[in-house]
UniProtKB/Swiss-Prot annotation:
Protein name per the record: Large ribosomal subunit protein bL17
Entry keyword annotation includes Disulfide bond: no
One GO biological process term: translation
InterPro entries: Ribosomal_bL17, Ribosomal_bL17_sf
Cited HAMAP family: Ribosomal_bL17
Family, per entry: Belongs to the bacterial ribosomal protein bL17 family.
Keywords, comma-separated and alphabetical: Ribonucleoprotein, Ribosomal protein
NCBIfam families per UniProt: L17 (TIGR00059)
Subunit structure comment from the entry: Part of the 50S ribosomal subunit. Contacts protein L32.
Region described as Disordered: 125-162
Taxonomic source organism: Oleidesulfovibrio alaskensis (strain ATCC BAA-1058 / DSM 17464 / G20)
Length: 162
């Protein structure tokens, strides 16, 4: 019986499961967003959120604990220097799981996207700024070509009637 046992087994041995989540955590912290099954995404939250909490502590022992999970000095440096400061003052909820509409074609597994909440906001703001500049440039240019086209059509119709 499964009394008081937390977490999903995902049809894997414990070592396979821990390796899976370690690799997925590395990918999520590297890319900021990954696409996976719903169950894996929900379980991955339990691995990544404590890592970000460690990054908020920002001391030597926290770095060593993060290295124990991630196994990469570069990724630990990124976690503590880039990702951690974006979540200062946030009391949890560092990741977001968005369910995708279409299941995976091969086995019909429900899919989801897991992403870091603050990194997505920063990327969206960076994308919106250039988009606004382009919109302003388009608004500044007058539409000169619309009027001549109508005049050309009328002239063509007059020529066809004559």
């Amino acid at each position: 019986m499964r009394h008081r046992k937390s977490g999903r087994k995902l049809n894997r041995s414990s070592s396979h499961r821990s390796a899976l989540f370690r690799n997925m955590a590395k990918s999520l912290l590297t890319y900021g967003k990954i696409r996976t099954t719903e169950a894996k995404a929900k379980e991955l939250r339990g691995v990544v959120e404590p890592l970000i909490t460690l990054a908020l502590r920002n001391d030597l022992h926290a770095r060593r604990q993060a290295y124990k999970v991630l196994g990469s000095h570069q990724l630990v440096k990124r976690l503590f220097d880039e990702i951690g400061p974006k979540f200062v003052g946030v009391p949890g909820g560092y990741t977001r799981v968005l369910k995708l509409g279409a299941p995976r074609p091969g086995d019909n597994a429900p899919m989801a996207v897991i992403e870091l909440t603050r990194l997505g906001d920063a990327e969206a703001a960076a994308k919106e700024a250039p988009a606004k500049e382009v919109a302003e440039e388009k608004a500044a240019k007058p539409a000169k070509k619309a009027a001549p086209k109508k005049a050309e059509k009328e002239e063509a119709e007059d020529a066809a009637e004559a």
